Regions:
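Single conserved hydrophobic/aromatic residue that forms the stacking wall/gate
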Residues: 1-15
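Residue-level signal for the start and early helices of compact helical domains
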Residues: 2, 156-159, 186, 431, ...
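Membrane-proximal, glycine/serine-rich, low-complexity loop/turn segments characteristic
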Residues: 17-283, 292-306, 469, 473, ...
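Short Gly/charged-rich anion-binding patches and loops
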Residues: 1, 219, 653
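Glycine-centered flexibility sites
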Residues: 5-8, 208, 700
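Low-complexity, intrinsically disordered/propeptide-like segments
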Residues: 9-11, 20, 25-26, 37, ...
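Exposed, low-structure sequence patches enriched in small/polar residues
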Residues: 13, 135-136, 161-163, 272-335, ...
Length: 707
């Protein structure tokens, strides 16, 4: 508390020092100097007080952040980050991490849960090991392998800070010829307490330890937000540009398992001579805004509209364009162990072709696929009593999406241009949410497509969170339910390219999920369980012999999935034993393959080198999953597909690291895959035929600047 003495009065008011009190004091014309009475008027040589110089320019009072989106505890933070909802008048607060927690994990596909199964290196695609974390993209699914890199409206970051914030990160590894690089820069600044802008740029990629595996993955998000007392607007521009050389994986697992090649660049790959390459381009613009209409008289005591009855009217628009260009030339590869002679010796077989079909041109491919989406939403949100009430908000909205698809067809030889297919989908949605103090948080939602493209699609969802306290420690029990009926993606039914052609008629998928979790954050404990049932599952799988004979398949029946997840970080003094374990069961591994056990273990010792100045962590990270028929990856389709030829797993992938935080700077030194050649069976694959990186040294630095 402070004692603020008012000028010209003997009153003394004791009050809490917060934005709400200061604003009201300013409105009443009171002195808001945090240090009491301002300096007295200066005296002349005779000791007489001089008259202050009259000024016609009055200092403008700066309004504090009054938005109903943020609670008092969030406003008190020096910097915070959030994402905006596409459908509703809501935001989702996200952590702004500047600690040592997991900064050493430079591959984004390894940061959540037990991580993903990656194709290989930084910038390349991956698929989550946990089935319930896998992306379910109806729009341009070709980009889904890069889900952990891509910016879009759902994850474009907005910031609010009391001081300008700049953070730079640089990580590199390996020799210059094979180097992986990760450069990130983030700048966020407030124009006023309610208005801010930010720029996030990330460039991640590799020159490739293996032959023909160079990758560039660049992502940028530029956002502007104004979160006023009544009017709010969020706008952003997103660009994703990805270039990948596609080597098609090793000619045989023996090339990795038997360690014949001293350098990974000598490992023979199947598409090296074909010079296969994918280029993905994406531009997206979005704007969502809302205006509040209070249903009660707003007084000076009402700091925000969160505690009043109100109606909010809003509109959201998004334009998103994706394209993918796949190129290659006719090329063959040689398998040095393609067969055996009568004496049991390996015999090389030449002339292997990765693709069996060349529908358009016999010597070269250039397949370009493009998808555009214009989305409009008009929504209303009612706040019957207050935003944190038992019934806090009731939402409803309508919208339509205009989808435009273009690809080459034989008829385009006559017209000289690609034919475009346009489809329009109409939908309506609604939700209701509420709270009971800090102990109960609940919501339910529904979305339906009554007609048009995707007509008949529907989704239902519900969420309940119960929060209690034991000796001051929060205990959180959550449950979720969802049921979704969704149409197949356009490209799953329609594709014409040099290597693949199909015109399918697929039924809608129907999936039901139930999730329960229990968390004790102060003790780093988390338990979770998922149960799912999928009917008419659509997937990529084999339609003939060989890896390239892949097509879209649909399972006529139900598949049941069960997942159990446990996370516990044990701490004994400075020793940390962080454990994450996932168990999964699938009733049909040919349709939805999952490993029985997946684990991420991180054991390290943390200590102060110089108290409150330099803190270090020294330890190791390990990843493991049991053997299963892991998915393969098809470059022309940019898709993971099910296969039953090669089992992958039973290999521990271990890194050793030293990480430190010195004031605002974070640094780390790491040797990745330190156990290569020391222990393990040598099968360091995570995706069929795609080996993980062999050992390499990495170093990184991240520095935050303020003001």
């Amino acid at each position: 508390e402070i004692c603020a003495c008012l000028v010209g009065s003997e009153m003394c008011i004791r009050d809490r020092l917060d934005a709400r009190s200061l604003m009201r004091a300013q409105q009443r014309g009171e002195n808001t100097n945090l240090y009491g009475v301002p300096n007295p008027a200066p005296e002349d040589e005779e000791g007489q007080a001089q008259q202050p110089v009259d000024s016609t320019k009055e200092k403008r009072i700066k309004k504090p952040l009054e938005s109903y989106f943020f609670s008092d505890s969030i406003r008190a933070l020096p910097n915070f980050k959030w994402n905006v909802s596409q459908d509703y008048n809501r935001v989702r607060i996200e952590p702004l991490d500047t600690t040592l927690t997991a900064w050493r994990i430079d591959y984004p596909f390894y940061r959540n849960g037990v991580g993903d199964a990656p194709i290989g290196a930084l910038g390349q695609g991956s698929v989550p090991l946990n089935y319930f974390e896998r992306p379910q993209w109806q729009d341009f699914s070709f980009a889904s392998p890069f889900h952990s890199y891509i910016y879009d409206m759902r994850n474009a970051p907005f910031y609010n800070g009391k001081r300008p914030f700049l953070q730079m990160t640089y990580i590199e590894s390996g020799q210059k010829r094979y180097r992986e690089t990760n450069f990130e820069i983030r700048h966020a600044q407030n124009i006023s307490p309610s208005t801010s802008f930010s720029i996030d740029y990330k460039s991640r990629g590799t020159r490739g330890l293996y032959e023909w595996s160079r990758t560039k993955n660049q992502n940028i998000a530029v956002t502007v937000a104004h979160t006023g007392k009544r009017y709010s607007v969020h706008a952003g521009y997103v660009n994703n540009h990805i270039e990948t050389q596609e080597n098609g994986g090793v000619v045989g697992e023996w090339a990795i398992r038997d360690t014949v090649f001293e350098m990974p660049s000598g490992v023979p790959m199947r598409l090296t001579n074909a010079k296969a390459e994918n280029i993905y381009r994406n531009h997206a613009f979005f704007l969502t805004q809302s205006y509040a209409i209070p249903l009660q008289r707003v007084t000076e005591n009402d700091f925000s509209l969160a505690d009043l009855s109100a109606v909010f009217i809003g509109h959201s628009i998004e334009y998103d364009i994706w394209s993918k260009t796949y190129t290659d030339i006719f090329g063959t590869y040689t398998d040095e162990r393609g067969s055996k002679d009568e004496n049991g010796n390996f015999v090389a077989t030449e002339g292997h072709e990765y693709y069996d079909n060349w529908f358009i041109h016999p010597d070269a491919s250039r397949d370009t696929l493009c998808e555009r989406r214009l989305s409009n939403r008009l929504f209303v949100q009612a706040q019957p009593w207050d935003r944190n009430g038992v019934i806090g908000t009731i939402d409803g909205g309508v919208g339509f999406d205009i989808h435009t698809y273009s690809q080459f067809a034989l008829g385009d030889y006559i017209t000289g241009k690609y034919r475009r297919t346009r489809k329009t989908s109409y939908f309506a949605y609604g939700s209701i949410a509420g709270k009971i103090k800090k102990y109960v948080d609940w919501d339910a939602n529904m979305k339906v497509y009554p007609s048009g493209y995707r007509g008949g699609d529907m989704s239902l969802g519900a969420h309940l969170a119960l929060k209690g306290y034991l000796r001051g420690h929060a205990l959180i029990l959550e449950g979720r339910f969802s049921n979704e009926k969704r149409s197949p993606g356009y490209w799953q039914e329609n594709l014409f390219s040099n290597h693949y052609v199909w015109s399918n008629s697929l039924a809608k998928e129907n999936e039901t999920r139930i999730e329960a979790s229990f968390r004790v954050p102060d003790y780093a404990l988390e338990l979770a369980a998922w149960q799912g049932v999928v009917k008419n599952k659509i997937y990529y799988g084999p339609v003939g012999p060989g890896d390239s004979n892949v097509g879209v398949l649909q399972h006529d029946g139900n598949v049941s999935l069960t997942s159990l997840y446990a996370r516990k970080d044990f701490r004994i003094g400075g020793l940390h034993l962080d454990n994450r374990v996932l168990l999964q069961w699938s009733t049909n591994q040919e349709v939805i393959p999952v490993p029985l056990v997946s684990a991420f273990l991180s054991y390290y010792y943390e200590f102060w080198v110089v108290r409150d100045v330099l803190r270090l962590q020294i330890g190791l990270d390990g990843r493991y999953n049991t053997k299963y028929y892991a998915p393969g990856y098809n470059p022309a389709l940019s898709a993971f597909y099910n296969q039953r030829e090669t089992e992958v797993g039973n290999y521990p992938y271990t890194d050793v690291f030293v990480m430190g935080k010195w004031k605002r700077m974070r640094i780390f030194l790491k040797y990745q895959h330190v156990n290569r050649g020391l222990f393990g069976n040598g099968d360091y694959f995570s995706v069929a035929r795609y080996p993980l990186n062999p050992g390499m040294f990495k170093m990184g630095i991240s520095w935050g600047f303020y003001d």
